[in-house]
């Protein structure tokens, strides 16, 4: 497949599900995967024989919970000792280890212990999305726009970009999910005059509220707020806890320590939750959930709403906060846009509607697909798409957190305020604190607190060689420059000497080095080749099996009774049975072994079948077009990844 230089895709890399779209022929296509689903679970599973990504990974999670990795987005760009990582680790069935301060996921793959960075897991999901798009478009795709929550800090954005590189993508830009949804919305509406839009994005794992102004094709993010740990999974957890208690009451047994039982229960709870968005009651039927006990139960919508009442009500706090940040009254909001699968929950919609005094909510865009839709449009814009639908769109994003440096006494001096439109550049003059000070330490922080110790250190560097002078005399010009991806460059220059030093905020926060990314790219290629090898192996096994069965049924055919001697018939049947029992015992043999066995079987059967031809036989093996020695090549049914 040749790459199409002018085509770029938009990927919504979600905590629980991902989605990919492409802008072509003047409209966005959301692309279905090989299972026919327009969203793909952000799951990667490792087994003794293969690696599975997406639906195939999620479908086997109950049998293999320790080696099925999800929620990589909760780990990406974070340190191991981050409180979020520490609290989430208690809930995950897979193991997370600490390697030089960074979290890695430990799994067993092909009988060996392997540890992966979150970037590598996310890159596998991105590879799946890339392949989904390539299968649809019929050519290679390398250019992509990837979305992240508005709340992601610099290191999380950078790590997401790295994941794209490992997956073999050229990441044109990282954009905020609500911004992407606004683009989708702007295209849908063809806006006239300035409109204030509130985007309420409640997905599988994160919750974001953003306020944007759309005016004449220009999008500006006015404020963002949210909760990095609220979403559909939390509602599932409430249901799981509820049913674990119910099981205890009914059967006097605690299933909470049995990972497989909990996982099966969780799958049923997720299904019940979806049902409750359109029905007022859902039934759960799980056969042999624990110690042979069948669990049949039901739940009403009202009970579900009660179980999650505090979580649902809590979604309004970020709405209020973003309105305060944008200095806007709720009456000034023109449109309320729902994004994310969890916004289908009727109670969530009702709370939001009541808060906005009964205003209609905008549900015209499929909430699961809005973000990928907008990312696909943005990808087309960046590739210079000339379609009038996208021509007039301009995109202004914001810095999610204030950026600044430490000054005397550990004070946070802000250069770029939170919610500033990016790209942006700010310069300020600083000076020395003591006489004849030869250098200054520039320490860069992000956060909203007054003291740097309460904020997040991004990086530090020294500017040395300042000529001796009394305190307060030297002039040091510090520039903060954020590009469109939200990546920060900080420069400090001594104005008297012109001497300067700079830092690009990446590495200090645990960004992967070039070498590590290079290694991961190669490993990703290797895994892809292994996956390919696995598919070929299965094809060879199936070919051998179907050939053996075909031969058995051919020689057992009534019409051939007189045409084939008993000894020949016995020879073929014995050999076929021998091959089939070898197959039973050697399911994991190599491709070459399967091919070799088939050759062996063909060499024995071909002369006998050829003899039949020459004797002018009739029957299934003698129909025109039947080639001896060729396995049936009907559709191969196998577990797809």
From Swiss-Prot:
Expressed in spermatids. GO terms for cellular component: cell body; COP9 signalosome; cytosol; zona pellucida receptor complex. This is Heat shock 70 kDa protein 1-like. Coiled coil: none annotated. Interacts with PRKN. Residues 396-511 are annotated as: Substrate-binding domain (SBD). Gene3D superfamilies: 1.20.1270.10, 3.30.30.30, 3.30.420.40, Actin, Chain A, domain 4, Substrate Binding Domain Of DNAk, Chain A, domain 1. GO terms for biological process: binding of sperm to zona pellucida; cell differentiation; positive regulation of protein targeting to mitochondrion; protein refolding; spermatogenesis. The N-terminal nucleotide binding domain (NBD) (also known as the ATPase domain) is responsible for binding and hydrolyzing ATP. The C-terminal substrate-binding domain (SBD) (also known as peptide-binding domain) binds to the client/substrate proteins. The two domains are allosterically coupled so that, when ATP is bound to the NBD, the SBD binds relatively weakly to clients. When ADP is bound in the NBD, a conformational change enhances the affinity of the SBD for client proteins. One of its GO terms (molecular function) is ubiquitin protein ligase binding. InterPro entries: ATPase_NBD, Heat_shock_70_CS, HSP70_C_sf, HSP70_peptide-bd_sf, Hsp_70_fam. Keywords: ATP-binding, Developmental protein, Differentiation, Nucleotide-binding, Spermatogenesis, Stress response. It comes from the Eukaryota. The keyword ATP-binding applies. The keyword Transmembrane does not apply. Molecular chaperone implicated in a wide variety of cellular processes, including protection of the proteome from stress, folding and transport of newly synthesized polypeptides, activation of proteolysis of misfolded proteins and the formation and dissociation of protein complexes. Plays a pivotal role in the protein quality control system, ensuring the correct folding of proteins, the re-folding of misfolded proteins and controlling the targeting of proteins for subsequent degradation. This is achieved through cycles of ATP binding, ATP hydrolysis and ADP release, mediated by co-chaperones. Belongs to the heat shock protein 70 family. It comes from Mus musculus (Mouse).
């Amino acid at each position: 497949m040749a790459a199409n230089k002018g085509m770029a895709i938009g990927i919504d890399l979600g905590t629980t599900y991902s989605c990919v779209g492409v802008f072509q022929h003047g409209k966005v296509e959301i692309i279905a995967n090989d299972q026919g689903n327009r969203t793909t679970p952000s799951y990667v599973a490792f087994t003794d024989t293969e690696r599975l990504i997406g639906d195939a990974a999620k479908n086997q999670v109950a049998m293999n919970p320790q080696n099925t990795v999800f929620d990589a987005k909760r780990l990406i760009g974070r340190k191991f000792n981050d409180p979020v990582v520490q609290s989430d680790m208690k809930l995950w069935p897979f193991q997370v280890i600490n390697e030089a301060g960074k979290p890695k996921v430990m799994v067993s793959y092909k009988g060996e212990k392997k540890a992966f960075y979150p970037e590598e897991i996310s890159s596998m999901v991105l590879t799946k999305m890339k392949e989904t798009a390539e299968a649809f478009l019929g050519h290679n795709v390398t250019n992509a726009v990837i979305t992240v929550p508005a709340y992601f800090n610099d290191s999380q954005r950078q790590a997401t970009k790295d994941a794209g590189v490992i997956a073999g993508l050229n990441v044109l830009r990282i954009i905020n999910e609500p911004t992407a949804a606004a683009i989708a919305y702007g295209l849908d509406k063809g806006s006239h005059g300035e409109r204030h839009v509130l985007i309420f994005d409640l997905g599988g794992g994160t919750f974001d509220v953003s306020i944007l102004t759309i005016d004449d094709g220009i999008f500006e993010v006015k404020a963002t707020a949210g909760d990095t740990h609220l979403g559909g999974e939390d509602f599932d957890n409430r249901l799981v806890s509820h049913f674990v208690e119910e099981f205890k009451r009914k059967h006097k047994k605690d299933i909470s320590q049995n990972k497989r039982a909990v996982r099966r229960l969780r799958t049923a709870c997720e299904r019940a939750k979806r049902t409750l968005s359109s029905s007022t009651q859902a039934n759960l039927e799980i056969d042999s959930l624990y110690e042979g006990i069948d669990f049949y139960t039901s739940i009403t919508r009202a009970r579900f709403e009660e179980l999650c009442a505090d979580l649902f009500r809590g979604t309004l706090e970020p709405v209020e906060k973003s309105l305060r940040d944008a200095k806007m009254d709720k009456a000034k909001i023109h449109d309320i846009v729902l994004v994310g699968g969890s916004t289908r929950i009727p109670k969530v919609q009702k709370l939001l509607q009541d808060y906005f005094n009964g205003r209609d909510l905008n549900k015209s865009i499929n909430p699961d697909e809005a973000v990928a839709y907008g990312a696909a449009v943005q990808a087309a814009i960046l590739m210079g798409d000339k379609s009038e639908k996208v021509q007039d769109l301009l995109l202004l994003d914001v810095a999610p957190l204030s950026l600044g440096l430490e000054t005397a006494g550990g004070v946070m001096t802000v250069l770029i305020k939170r919610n500033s439109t990016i790209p942006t550049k700010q310069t300020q003059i600083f000076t020395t604190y003591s006489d004849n000070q030869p250098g200054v330490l520039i320490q860069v922080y992000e956060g909203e607190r007054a003291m740097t110790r309460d904020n997040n250190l991004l990086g530090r560097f020294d500017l040395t060689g300042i000529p001796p002078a009394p305190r307060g005399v030297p002039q040091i010009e510090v520039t903060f420059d954020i590009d469109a991806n939200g990546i920060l460059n900080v420069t400090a220059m001594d104005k008297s000497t012109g001497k300067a030093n700079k830092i690009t905020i990446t590495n200090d926060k645990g960004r992967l080095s070039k070498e590590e990314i290079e290694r991961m790219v190669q490993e990703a290629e290797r895994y892809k080749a292994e996956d390919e090898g696995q598919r070929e192996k299965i094809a060879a096994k199936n070919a051998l099996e179907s050939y053996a069965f075909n031969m058995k049924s051919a020689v057992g055919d009534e019409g051939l009774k007189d045409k084939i001697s008993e000894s020949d018939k016995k020879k073929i049947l014995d050999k076929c049975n021998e091959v089939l029992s070898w197959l039973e015992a050697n399911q994991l043999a190599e491709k070459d072994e399967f091919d070799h066995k088939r050759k062996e079987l063909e060499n024995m059967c071909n002369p006998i079948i050829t003899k039949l031809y020459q004797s002018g036989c009739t029957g299934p093996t003698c129909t025109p077009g039947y080639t001896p020695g060729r396995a049936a090549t009907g559709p191969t049914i196998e577990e797809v990844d």
